[in-house]
């Protein structure tokens, strides 16, 4: 038995009072059989298709048979932590959902009157890209919630493998998919060679891969307004012990 509880209460005169509750509950729940799509397929090598405006543009395997695939332990620890702290710092500790992050993102979107922040966890992003079509409607959101819940609560794919898949399929620029292509495209390096500044820059692109050029001034250097983002991520890296406090304090948006 599965039950889904959802509550959204908005006072547009006081957006900070917005209430958002979303919870999937189970009682004596067991999976008898899966449908045509295996929800555990990310655990092994599988074929991934990237889409642009609903049209497939790239298809490639996520595993050792792909020359662009990079195992998690071959990716710079600084890059791994930079992306995680930017996208979903609690990824290894939650079960796929962060209601507070969704609430804050919704409040911000309503304040600026546009879709500016998604609030999706890494698991949610994976489910959207690997399992679902590109339709944006309530039925698809329910599908997404159910698949996320099943993968996380039934432990169909390990967190380490999910993060490995994520870093190998995420878009880092127009038709630039995965960390190996991104490292070569921007810095002519392997993923294991990325510096702190380069790693933070790549993390900053993920929310806007098609518009990465907006981060640069006319002279080719990063814009000054990137400094706050660099400082924030560097501080989190230092808190995680990935870099030193001295390096975090001296970080600059300079690549």
Model-derived features: where do they sit?
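Juxtamembrane regions of bacterial inner-membrane/periplasmic proteins
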Residues: 1-255
